[in-house]
Design a protein with these regions (language model features):
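Single-stranded nucleic acid-binding surfaces, predominantly the OB-fold ssDNA-binding core
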Residues: 1-110
Length: 110
């Protein structure tokens, strides 16, 4: 058995996009997490670093996201890491890594 659990706290980068799959609501949005700049023990400067994460929310979570989450909202997120591959119109393969949200809390709203 193995577990892939992701816990993030960050800022929403864009308003959720809502679509329906077999009449189930699905929200897609981005979340930025930032490691602050710091100085190492030997004096080396390490710059600030921001990572962007693709979030996917289903059903009730998607409905809540559509109603309450906007760009700039600070979220606490727990979920599973999923990677999928898809092919575009030009038959070019793309790979995307997403967080399938299992639990979240809105820490502040914009």
């Amino acid at each position: 058995m193995s577990i892939i659990k992701v816990i993030l706290v960050g800022n929403v980068g864009r308003d959720p996009e809502i679509r329906y799959v077999e009449s189930r609501p699905v929200a897609s949005l981005s979340l930025a997490t930032t490691e602050k700049a710091y100085t190492t023990a030997n004096g080396a400067q390490v710059p600030e670093r921001t990572e962007w994460h693709n979030l996917v929310m289903w059903d009730r979570a998607a409905e809540i996201a559509e109603k309450y989450i906007r760009k700039g909202t600070i979220l606490f997120v727990e979920g599973k890491l999923r990677t999928r591959t898809w092919e575009d119109r030009n038959t070019i393969k793309h790979t995307v890594t997403e967080i399938y949200v299992e639990n979240f809390d809105i820490l502040s709203r914009q």
